[in-house]
């Protein structure tokens, strides 16, 4: 999913990646929250695909670091997830059950999607008496 958000000017470069670990308390009080951190999900990773130009210096400064904020287009990165199903078809859409994270580490619980699109099957592994697939998946929520 493509999203326009704000990032500090020193970090705004095409191809740059960042992960939102947690939204700081200061962000909730900021008047830019709705177009900045409010558009991102904790635990998810993003890649900057475009830096939008500003004709004038931005009057908006980040409450955390004091940097000038600039608009960027970001795309959510795919997740590596375990899927415990009898078979997997790349391109298919399936629900995701967080109980599948027992045998393979998953992103933080708040970052886990309820539905995913399978992009690529990476591996098939055994867990206890069963098997699961390790996949690259695009979150759909």
From Swiss-Prot:
Cysteine pairings via disulfide bonds: none
UniProt cross-references to InterPro entries, sorted A to Z: UPF0179 (IPR005369)
Lineage: superkingdom: Archaea
Family the entry assigns: Belongs to the UPF0179 family.
One protein family per Pfam: UPF0179
The protein's name: UPF0179 protein Cmaq_1008
